[in-house]
Structure formats: C-alpha cells, structure tokens
Amino acid sequence: MPTINQLIRKPRAPLVARDKVPALQECPQKRGVCTRVYTTTPKKPNSALRKVARVRLTNGYEVISYIPGEGHNLQEHSVVMIRGGRVKDLPGVRYHIIRGVLDTQGVKDRRQRRSLYGAKRPK
C-alpha cells in the first residue's frame, strides 16, 4: 500500500483494456484472402471437426477465422470478409468469416437466424 507522498510523486496508472480483435484495427470488418482452409478439433470437453481458415488481411495481418454454418465453398485464394468474435472452444480463433459476402456463399436451406448466415428468405 503506497503512502500519500508516494501517490503524489507517482499517481496510480489507469488500467488499459487490451484489444480483443487487434487485426481489425478498430474497423467493423476487414477483407482478406484465404491462405489455408482446414478443420481443427476443439479443446476439452467438446469433440468435433470445426471448419477454420487462415486469412491474410488487406492490412497484412494473418489471422485464423471460423467458418460458421453447415457446409461451405471456401478454398485457398477465396476472398472473404471477417468480423470479430471468438470461438470459445478453439484457442487462437478470434474472428468469424461473414457468410453470403464476397466469395463466401450463404448457408443452404437455413430457416432461422438467416441474416447471420447470408441465407435468402425461403419461398
């Protein structure tokens, strides 16, 4: 515990919050090119093959982003748009690819929460 005199000499430094999505550089979304599309396994206690892509962004950052929804058409050199948002059971995955934008197709036969998956309204 500092004394009053110590606090006068050197005041308390404010806590600085660390940026959760540094690669976006304060932008809502960023465009990038897939350099590798692959599956990975989540940490315990979950079990699955989660679809992820390594994306090189327009600002030079290279990040791992999650591909949401069932089925996708992404491959190497696909141009994608990413947003922030981590995947809790995949360490190091702090971004999501936006479905239905640029080279990413929307999810087929999606009926609920369609706007999140780039799906058109069914007839």
Curated annotation (Swiss-Prot):
Gene Ontology molecular function: rRNA binding; structural constituent of ribosome; tRNA binding
Database matches in CDD domains: Ribosomal_S12
Signal peptide segment: none
UniProt xrefs under InterPro entries: NA-bd_OB-fold, Ribosomal_uS12, Ribosomal_uS12_bac
Cited PROSITE patterns: RIBOSOMAL_S12
Sites of 3-methylthioaspartic acid modification: 89
GO BP terms: translation
UniProt KW keywords: Methylation, Ribonucleoprotein, Ribosomal protein, RNA-binding, rRNA-binding, tRNA-binding
HAMAP family named among the record's database cross-references: Ribosomal_uS12_B
UniProt subunit comment: Part of the 30S ribosomal subunit. Contacts proteins S8 and S17. May interact with IF1 in the 30S initiation complex.
Cited NCBIfam families: rpsL_bact
Role played: With S4 and S5 plays an important role in translational accuracy. Interacts with and stabilizes bases of the 16S rRNA that are involved in tRNA selection in the A site and with the mRNA backbone. Located at the interface of the 30S and 50S subunits, it traverses the body of the 30S subunit contacting proteins on the other side and probably holding the rRNA structure together. The combined cluster of proteins S8, S12 and S17 appears to hold together the shoulder and platform of the 30S subunit.
Entry similarity comment: Belongs to the universal ribosomal protein uS12 family.
The protein's name in its UniProt record: Small ribosomal subunit protein uS12
Protein's organism: Rhodospirillum centenum (strain ATCC 51521 / SW)
